[in-house]
C-alpha cells in the first residue's frame, strides 16, 4: 500500500519537474522568436527610413557639411515643380505679371497655385557650377547655342544622372578610371586640367612627370569639366586648385526627377560619352520656338506628359544637382 503511494508521489513529482522543464523550454523558444521578430522589425524599419549609401555631401561648399539622406517618400499635399530658364526669357517677355499668368495656366493642368516655381539663371556655364534643384520635379530650359554645345551636353549629363564621388588628392596620388561610368568631375570659377598617362614603371607616356608643360590638356578655363581618360592607366593630374576642385566619380544611374528641355537646335544634344551607345533619353527633350512665350505655352500644354516620364524625388536636393556620397 505504501509502495503504491510512494510511486504515485514519485510520478507526481516527476510530472511537475517535466512540466517545469517543458514550460522553460517553451519560454526560451518564445523569447527567441520574439527577439528575432523584434530584430527583423527594427532592421526593416531602419532600411525603409534611410539609404545605405552613407552620408550625402554637396558637390560645392564644405565637405564637412552633412545633409540628411532619406529614401522616405514624404506625403505632400501637392508636388512641386521648378522651371529653370535663362534671364533672356524674362527680358524678352517684358511683363511684370508673366509668372502669375503662367501659374494660372498651370492651374488648368492640375498644378495648384504656389506649386510651380520659376527660377532664373544668367548663363549655362554659371548654372552648371551651382544648379540648385529644389523641387519634386525640375525642368531645366537650355537655349541652344552652337558655341556652347559641349557645355550644354556636360551640364545635361551632370544633372540627369546621379553620381557617387570622392575627393582626389592629386598632389600625393596617381589616379586611374575603372570603366565607362567612372569620370573625373572638376568644377570652379576656372578649371584647367592636364594629365600625364603613366606606364607600369610610373614613367610618363608622351610626357614628363616633372614637367607640367608636357602634360596633355583635357580642359581649359572651364567651370564644369567631365574628364574621361583611358581606363586602367594611372595618370598624374595637374589642376588649378586655387579656382577649381576635382572629384573621382562613378555614375550610378539616372536622376529621374530632372528633365532638360532644349530650346532650338536641329537635334537633341547627345549627352553620352560612349560613342557605341544610343544617346536618346526620354528626359532630354526639344522645343523649336523663337519666342519665349511660345516656349512656356508649349511646356504648360505638355507638362503632364513630361512629368509622366519622370519620377518624383526620393531625397532632398540642395546646393547642387547631385550629391557626393562617401
UniProtKB/Swiss-Prot annotation:
It holds the Pfam family VP7. One of its GO terms (cellular component) is T=13 icosahedral viral capsid. Its main location: virion. Disulfide bonds join 82-135, 165-249, 191-244, 196-207. Residues 253-255 are annotated as: GPR motif. Glycans are attached at residues 69, 238. Ca(2+) 1 binds at residues 95, 206, 214, 216. Belongs to the rotavirus VP7 family. Some rotavirus strains are neuraminidase-sensitive and require sialic acid to attach to the cell surface. Some rotavirus strains are integrin-dependent. Some rotavirus strains depend on ganglioside for their entry into the host cell. Hsp70 also seems to be involved in the entry of some strains. In group A rotaviruses, VP7 defines the G serotype. Homotrimer; disulfide-linked. 2 Ca(2+) ions bound at each subunit interface in the trimer hold the trimer together. Interacts with the intermediate capsid protein VP6. Interacts with the outer capsid protein VP5*. This is Outer capsid glycoprotein VP7. It comes from Rotavirus A (strain RVA/Human/Japan/K8/1977/G1P3A[9]) (RV-A). The lineage of its organism: Viruses, Riboviria, Orthornavirae, Duplornaviricota, Resentoviricetes.
Amino acid at each position: 500500500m505504501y509502495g503504491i503511494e510512494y510511486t504515485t508521489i514519485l510520478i507526481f513529482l516527476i510530472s511537475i519537474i517535466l512540466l517545469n522543464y517543458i514550460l522553460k523550454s517553451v519560454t526560451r523558444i518564445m523569447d527567441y522568436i520574439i527577439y528575432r521578430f523584434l530584430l527583423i522589425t527594427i532592421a526593416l524599419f531602419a532600411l525603409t527610413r534611410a539609404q545605405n549609401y552613407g552620408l550625402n555631401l554637396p558637390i560645392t561648399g564644405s565637405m564637412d557639411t552633412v545633409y540628411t539622406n532619406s529614401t522616405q517618400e514624404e506625403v505632400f499635399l501637392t508636388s512641386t515643380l521648378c522651371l529653370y530658364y535663362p534671364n533672356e526669357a524674362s527680358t524678352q517677355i517684358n511683363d511684370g505679371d508673366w509668372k502669375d499668368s503662367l501659374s494660372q495656366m498651370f492651374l488648368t493642368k492640375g498644378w495648384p497655385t504656389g506649386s510651380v516655381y520659376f527660377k532664373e539663371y544668367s548663363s549655362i556655364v554659371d548654372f552648371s557650377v551651382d544648379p540648385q534643384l529644389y523641387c519634386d520635379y525640375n525642368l531645366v530650359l537650355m537655349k541652344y547655342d552652337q558655341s556652347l554645345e559641349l557645355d550644354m551636353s556636360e551640364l545635361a549629363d551632370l544633372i540627369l544622372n546621379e553620381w557617387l564621388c570622392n575627393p582626389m588628392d592629386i598632389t600625393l596620388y596617381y589616379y586611374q578610371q575603372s570603366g565607362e561610368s567612372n569620370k573625373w568631375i572638376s568644377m570652379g570659377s576656372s578649371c584647367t586640367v592636364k594629365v600625364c598617362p603613366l606606364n607600369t614603371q610610373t614613367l610618363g607616356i608622351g610626357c614628363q612627370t616633372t614637367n607640367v608643360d608636357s602634360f596633355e590638356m583635357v580642359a581649359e578655363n572651364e567651370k564644369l569639366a567631365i574628364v574621361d581618360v583611358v581606363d586602367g592607366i594611372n595618370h598624374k593630374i595637374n589642376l588649378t586648385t586655387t579656382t577649381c576642385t576635382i572629384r573621382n566619380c562613378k555614375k550610378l544611374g539616372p536622376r529621374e526627377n530632372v528633365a532638360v528641355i532644349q530650346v532650338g537646335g536641329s537635334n537633341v544634344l547627345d549627352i553620352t560619352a560612349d560613342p557605341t551607345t544610343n544617346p536618346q533619353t526620354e528626359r532630354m527633350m526639344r522645343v523649336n520656338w523663337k519666342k519665349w512665350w511660345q516656349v512656356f505655352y508649349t511646356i504648360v500644354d505638355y507638362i503632364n506628359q513630361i512629368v509622366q516620364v519622370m519620377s518624383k524625388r526620393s531625397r532632398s536636393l540642395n546646393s547642387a544637382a547631385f550629391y557626393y556620397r562617401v
